[in-house]
Amino acid sequence: MVLLHVKRSDKDTFLFDTPAATEVDVVLREVVAIHNLRQKIGRLAAQVEGLAAHGPMKVPEQQGLDDETPLLEDYDVKDGTTKARAPPERGAHFCPDPSERRTGNAPSPELAAVLTKTVEDAKALASERQVQMKVATTQKALADAVGNIRGAVMIAYPMGLPDYDAVRQILEEREAVDGAAGLEELEIEKASLWCFNKELQREKLLSEYVGKNDKSKVMHLHRKAISKQNETTKKN
């Protein structure tokens, strides 16, 4: 077995344990899956924290608007007047969202605590601090963490979230990943592993590059379209 220290950056890093006789293609597929799951947990955690604090999202056309700003349907094109918006319903645990993206109708403190604790556990599994603690990351553990978040959301919102809520869209694999987040997502066909300034060829065995001992090897995970000189690796 060899312990791979996989890096995209100093903050985007994790340990992966695998037999030295594994094909590079198999390793790369697992590493990319772990990388993408870590990114997903980061996005999901941020949205669930917002859900716990400020409740479900507003309908898309109202996101970013306060409760008094007129909507398009409030304007009368015939006489140019504007109707006053009816005040929205406010729950017992109303907490306004400064970004005006969520309704402010937060869950009870007890349910919010369930959401927050589950997210904290998932973030800990995906954290770069796992490297410092010498804990290898597995695809199953991260997938289970996402499943736990799904369960916590179902407990807090048994009737389900709106179709347009970001939490639901992430859990249902329907999110539009773009911008900086999109750049961090990797496709297996466009990913590559580098070690000792060499790109690992997929058809070869991992042992041809790192040997068969159990020392840690630093692997750099890159998008193939990016031309970047890789740093030399270090043995622990």
Task: Name each region found by the language model.
Residues 1-236:
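Ubiquitin system architectures
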